[in-house]
Amino acid sequence: MRSLISVAVLSALPTAFSQANTSYTDYNVEANPDLFPLCLQHLNASFPDCASGPLSLTPVCDRSLSPKDRATALVSLFTFDELVNNTGNTGLGVSRLGLPNYQVWGEALHGVGRANFVESGNFSWATSFPMPITMMAALNKTLIHQIGTIVSTQLRAFSNAGLGGVDVYSPNINTFRHPVWGRGQETPGEDAFLTSVYGYEYITALQGGVDPETLKIIATAKHYAGYDIESWNNHSRLGNDMQITQQELSEYYTPPFIVASRDAKVRSVMCSYNAVNGVPSCANKFFLQTLLRDTFEFSEDGYVSGDCGAVYNVWNPHGYASNEAAASADSILAGTDIDCGTSYQWHSEDAFEDSLVSRSDIERGVIRLYSNLVQAGYFDGEDAPYRDITWDDVLSTDAWNIAYEAAVEGIVLLKNDETLPLSKDIKSVAVIGPWANVTEELQGNYFGPAPYLISPLTGFRDSGLDVHYALGTNLTSHSTSGFEEALTAAKQADAIIFAGGIDNTIEAEAMDRENITWPGNQLDLISKLSELGKPLVVLQMGGGQVDSSSLKDNDNVNALIWGGYPGQSGGHALADIITGKRAPAGRLVTTQYPAEYAEVFPAIDMNLRPNETSGNPGQTYMWYTGTPVYEFGHGLFYTTFEESTETTDAGSFNIQTVLTTPHSGYEHAQQKTLLNFTATVKNTGERESDYTALVYVNTTAGPAPYPKKWVVGFDRLGGLEPGDSQTLTVPVTVESVARTDEQGNRVLYPGSYELALNNERSVVVKFELKGEEAVILSWPEDTTSDFVSSIDGGLDRKQDVIA
């Protein structure tokens, strides 16, 4: 018998299993999944009644039992149809038991993003913070944690009001490898260490700590793994098969997921659309069991959710399975517990009837989901922790103004000839360009309604300056019809602010950029404005970098600022930086490459190391052999700083001694601090400013080739007045100085190492590792990349399922 959910929807919806091959969408090219309404549905959320409802006499309501035992008891009560109905992100619940439906799909990338917002009044908005790419540029761990804490509080308020669940598909902890990637804006940048720390802080803030007794919000680390291309050159994310060496999987693509699982104790992980080395991520037992659970220590009770439609994609377009039922079976057995989509709900019964999966196989994932809902207090009534959070808490946390602080701290000053901050003699400004008067664009993507959105134009008007506004040109326009109005406005002002760059019409989910140049004729208009002989400040907005070399080289462009996606208070933050009310201290967390970088080798080449044969010049700041326009870690101040240290030689450390010394407070010896990088930072200029620090390591220990350097720590010092000094102390962990061999093992190699402060290397501290090399993470052998599915009777991995 077809499951109840199928009976309910078959008459209303087209189904994949009823379509002929000729009607299939070619998802090798199309990057947007065609999700059924059931998957996309917003539900009226409610909590189970454990006081007097049918569930009240069942073990799921017994708080003396463990979350897993409670969940197991609940799922054991389901009929087979009821079980299947709760395998998708839109779970139908079980009405006869009083178990309400539940929507797993929530969003909290930089604020509450997918709740059931009402039209006006209470619960019509939530705080909209800067995008993660801008957050991370602040280099402030405390700020990231604050934001995550506020977001989790606001999520709980919506949940308690019946407007959302207690889990989210956030954060995105993929690394921003290639500059054309449309979703790089959602990430903390191109560095795996920074991404790992960001993930740790955001996850533990969302969840209410490291493995708390009661989960505040269930976080989901996504997209696991090797996912960083949307649609480049018609290579769809839904069908991409990314070829990645075990060395670089271990070294670059998975460390954020190790930290999320082992250290932050994240309770959910999302497997990605793409395949890696021939195996779709959601059907990859090596990824989901051998690595994630056995090696990365992801909780046995944590659940894996497929990206939305990714289980279906195991069949179409990957061709790894012969049909959608086999794709469901492959994914269930590999370890994908919940299907964001409808494949499990519509086809796991077929898989069961064909003896591809057992009831217990299907139960495992549903038990894991409900185990986490139990731990989040979902079944524990109004006296459960966090159930007292209300709309008043949304109002109070928004009033903390952290969205403004995050925008200010994430702004990066790329170029300045002392034009900034603007002189007090400047009384009027012309605000020109396609980003000048935007509002919603400030939010990037995955956002909900904000309480307000302050455009750059409004920000300058609120600063007290006399403002002249002209659009000038649109982002992608080649028309010069607005140039004259822009030039007229500029001539009337003492200084010119051009706000442009890119936005989510150019970089987005399912849409990579074709190039990394400034789109349209924005540079032409900037060039004409630069000929007027007035102070000219350019705001480069958007998540991904564009080649601003012409602006860097133009002496008449006096200052250049990267603002990213600064959120609801972005306009005030930008204006306050430019007028000098606040001082910039952000640093780029991506490399700004010259335009030709995006043209000389395929964006789907996942190899970081340079390769003359393929034309790959090396990817990320660690391996790039060319000259960037602006380096990763670049960022200027309004003041000057002097950095010094008492010693430039930290001595030597015996590897075996380090690893065998007791490590109280750490689960593994490699997590402990090897040494503290310490420097005195003095403000030698005339303006108060924060100071940001990146600490790099470099070495020729271990296998060649050698990365130029890599990040091992960072910090932000606040509010240094002129003449003041502060001590910078950055812990450097044992595992952060390890390298990766060709098999993927993380190894401590004996040899000489240097720690350097920022790109300028203003402080350099040497140390030496002695003794025998030692493996601190053994990378298991991947036996699945050449795996031929026994479920499918030995079919080839990549079938031609598209007509």
Curated annotation (Swiss-Prot):
GO terms for molecular function: alpha-L-arabinofuranosidase activity; xylan 1,4-beta-xylosidase activity. Its EC number is 3.2.1.37. Its main location: secreted. Pathway: Glycan degradation; xylan degradation. It catalyses: Hydrolysis of (1->4)-beta-D-xylans, to remove successive D-xylose residues from the non-reducing termini. Keywords: Carbohydrate metabolism, Glycoprotein, Glycosidase, Hydrolase, Polysaccharide degradation, Secreted, Signal, Xylan degradation. Coiled coil: none annotated. Glycans are attached at residues 21, 44, 85, 122, 140, 234, 437, 474, 515, 611, 676, 698. Residues 1-18 form the signal peptide. Pfam families: Fn3-like (PF14310), Glyco_hydro_3 (PF00933), Glyco_hydro_3_C (PF01915). GO terms for cellular component: extracellular region. One of its GO terms (biological process) is xylan catabolic process. Belongs to the glycosyl hydrolase 3 family. Xylan 1,4-beta-xylosidase involved in the hydrolysis of xylan, a major structural heterogeneous polysaccharide found in plant biomass representing the second most abundant polysaccharide in the biosphere, after cellulose. This is Exo-1,4-beta-xylosidase xlnD. It comes from Emericella nidulans (strain FGSC A4 / ATCC 38163 / CBS 112.46 / NRRL 194 / M139). The gene is xlnD.
